Amino acid sequence: MSAQTWTGRILQQIKGVNPFGGDCVPSRVSLFGPGRPAMPVPLPWNYKEPIQIFEAFYSEADRETGWGKHNRYLYAAGLPPVLVTRDPGIIKAIQADTGDKPGQFDRDTSPTAGIARATGEDSLLYANGSIWRRQKSMVAKPFSRSNLFQPQKFHGFEETFRKTAMKRLEALRAAQKSSGEGSTRVELDLEIKVVMLEMLVNNFFGGTASYDELRDRFIPAVVYMIDHMVRDTVAPRAQSIARKLSGGEKILQQHRADFEKLTDIALSGRSEGLGLWNEFHSEAPDEALRSNIRVFLAGAMEATTSFASWAISHLSHNPEWQARVYDEVKDMDVYDPDDFTKAPNLNRVLEETLRLTPALYFFPRRATVDTWVETSDQRKMMIPKGTHIRLDVWHSNRCEEFWGEDVTGYPADVFAPGRWDIIEERGLSAKDMLHFGFGHGPRFCPGRSLGLLEVGLVVGALIKIFKFKAVNDETGASAGVSTKPADGVLVDLELRNAE
């Protein structure tokens, strides 16, 4: 940034000039203010509460008239503006205009700097421009719904899950028998992580890793590396010093080595065309693929675990919907793609989970030039070059104006799968009611179909075997790379065949 640019911004900021244009300009947020849950910027002492950081942008927003209460910006210290929006029209327009063409929005890489340092900068997640376009074309076929939802491949995922589920079921039966209790209190978060990583490594990539090795070695490594990526993004120098003083550098190196070993296992099936490697067509050497494999292993495990954990957590608070899904899956001995996709109650539960508690709670973008965006209802906004954009889908999906009783028949901030029936009855289409659970536009998440397949299998099979009830009356959210239930999905499990 040149001195001239910095000086110009400082003058604008002092004068209170709004750098945005159009008929739905955002309103300004001050850096400091009373009564807010957090400062509106990530700092070493608040970065573990990103949802509260976003909430700070909407402090006193109800005093604004028009679209300024949903589109907010921070402009301080001579730095570029930061636009945070929960306006679904603006979110959709910006995502649709993100890509590699001149004048389109880039993915803002600043929130993922730590991820890039740990996994590589040439990944589909981090790259922009022609590198991103090339990476996207390579993964399109393996991740496609038409490919994953073929019966043979679908059954492969199911068989892996069935073996793991039976192993854990026998362990649970033994524990209940020895204790004499009809239910067992467990945190399901770790078990969900193992199942998701197992299907990803052994089915998708055609590798071979045992349940025990995944649980005891690779899950701890991946979880540690994900936490390290977040810390390394917010305060890299401070974290480096802290590791050296505490001896944490040795721990990091061990987990990094285990993460690399897991990457080796995922790549091992490529030469024989195992798993989905036979759908992957590229002459690139294995070494050139490592960045993407690391991102897929960490990102897909994290996102699908979040998705499944939230679905199970919501159902643990909703016995009525748990019973509805059970009625759909109880007679399914083998899950076929047609049976799975035609289970309306299960699919409503998954859709509502993505709406209320999306794993990816915001999407970062950056304006490469002064850019005009137009919404489907013809509103316009000019976003100045260099603006950091945060598409806040978490708060968008919980906003009463967009998802509340007047629109969907239910309050926006409650889990209500029945709202999707009302949406359909009122003639609203999927395009009208986007929840952005997997993003939108050219940079939507390529793992959408894989996530739906894995999570549908896990949730359906769990309900078929167990009744489960939440231990806590309410379950809060924690957030880092993704969101997840803060209690680790703490439930009381009861075997259905014990009735």
Segments and roles (model prediction):
Residues A303-S316, V458:
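Short, small-residue alpha-helix embedded
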Residues T353, G386, G441, V455, ...:
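Hydrophobic, well-ordered secondary-structure elements that form the walls
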Residues L391-R426:
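Conserved cytochrome P450 K-helix/beta-meander segment immediately N-terminal to the heme-binding cysteine loop
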Residues R107-A113, P151-A308:
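Cytochrome P450 heme-thiolate monooxygenase catalytic core
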Residues P319-W321, H440-F444, R448-A486:
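Cytochrome P450 heme-binding "Cys pocket" and the immediately downstream C-terminal segment
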Residues L43-T65, S268, Y335-R379:
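Conserved cytochrome P450 K-helix E-x-x-R motif and the immediately C-terminal K′/meander segment
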Residues S2-E121, S130-R134, R162-K163, K385, ...:
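N-terminal membrane-proximal hinge/A-helix region immediately C-terminal to the signal-anchor transmembrane segment
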Residues K484-E499:
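C-terminal helix/juxtamembrane-tail motif
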